[in-house]
């Protein structure tokens, strides 16, 4: 069973220390977040060498967007987030294609993205646009031998499954974020684990609360202090024969972050070995 966390690499010269720190803290894998102005082969070589030396598997490149127009809310992000943004989508897809080559060069098989909000109505123009855009990215990745993982949250689980089936390239899967579904107010991870089944390639371990303000996401909490029913989530994942990677994600930024992640890892191992 594989356990990891996020590795947010801000400067390429920090790669060796960053991967060594993961090894020191008993992680065997990570989701890499690296968003340079331009992806280069040399940067990929440095990252791969650091990961290999420390025996850390890069389970996915979490390919964000270079811009900062996404606000992570339930209002402006319907227009501004994701690859389906009329204003920013085209530029983001081109950046993702750079990221895909980088992912190939660092040795991972998976590129993970926030695609954007997905329309419920399969006959709507918005839904058709999203299918076509995801297909464009997925086909580009498939030519490189890569999978596209869609982060859960901005749609109900059954809508995400429909989208994956309608794209139909065979290399599109889901990353189940246990808190996002609750924080977006669009579902819960127990149902999602059941609905998505073997489409789940990785899981983000995160806890949170439902939204109460119509324009704002629910709040993230510490592990086991929110609305996520982790024992039931893990039970359903076990029934699906999912064996990891489990990636601890903590977006709460404070001085106790490293300690809290270490504590979550210990709790997680105990729960999954029970």
Each model region followed by its residue ranges:
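N-terminal small/glycine-rich loop or linker at the start of catalytic domains
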Residues: 1-6, 60, 64-81
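Flexible loop residues that form catalytic
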Residues: 35, 66, 116, 153, ...
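Short, well-structured secondary-structure segments
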Residues: 28-34, 57-61, 109-113
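Glycine-rich, proline-tolerant flexible connector loops at the mouths of alpha/beta enzymes
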Residues: 31-52, 115-122
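Alpha-helix-loop-beta-strand connector modules within alpha/beta enzyme cores
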Residues: 48-65, 131-144, 230-233
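Histidine-acidic metal/acid-base catalytic patches
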Residues: 1-4, 9-28, 45, 52-54, ...
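Active-site acidic/histidine proton-transfer and metal-coordination neighborhood
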Residues: 13-17, 53, 70-173
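Short catalytic-loop micro-motif centered on adjacent basic/acidic residues
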Residues: 4-6, 30-34, 147-151
């Amino acid at each position: 069973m594989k356990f990891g966390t996020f590795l947010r690499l801000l400067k390429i010269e920090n790669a060796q220390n960053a991967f060594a720190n993961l090894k020191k803290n008993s992680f065997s894998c990570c989701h890499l977040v690296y968003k340079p102005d331009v992806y280069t082969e040399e940067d990929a070589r440095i990252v791969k060498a650091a990961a290999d030396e420390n025996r850390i598997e890069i389970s996915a490149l979490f390919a964000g967007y270079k811009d900062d127009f996404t606000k992570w809310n339930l209002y402006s992000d319907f227009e501004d987030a994701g690859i389906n943004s009329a204003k920013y989508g085209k530029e983001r897809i081109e950046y993702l294609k750079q990221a895909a080559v980088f992912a190939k060069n660092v040795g991972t098989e998976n590129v993970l993205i926030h695609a954007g909000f997905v329309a419920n109505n399969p006959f709507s123009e918005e839904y058709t646009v999203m299918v076509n855009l995801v297909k464009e990215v997925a086909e580009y990745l498939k030519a490189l031998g890569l999978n596209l993982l869609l982060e859960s949250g901005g749609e109900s689980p059954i809508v995400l499954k429909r989208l994956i089936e309608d794209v139909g390239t065979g290399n599109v899967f889901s990353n189940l974020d246990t808190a996002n579904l609750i924080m977006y107010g669009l579902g819960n991870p127990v149902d999602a684990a059941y609905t998505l089944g073997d489409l789940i390639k990785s899981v983000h371990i995160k806890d949170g609360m439902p939204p109460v303000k119509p324009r704002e996401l629910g709040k993230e909490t510490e592990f086991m202090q929110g609305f996520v029913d982790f024992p039931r989530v893990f039970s359903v994942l076990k029934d699906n024969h999912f064996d990891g990677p489990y990636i601890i994600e903590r977006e709460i930024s404070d001085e106790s972050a490293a300690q809290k992640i270490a504590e979550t890892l210990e709790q997680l191992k105990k729960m999954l070995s029970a």
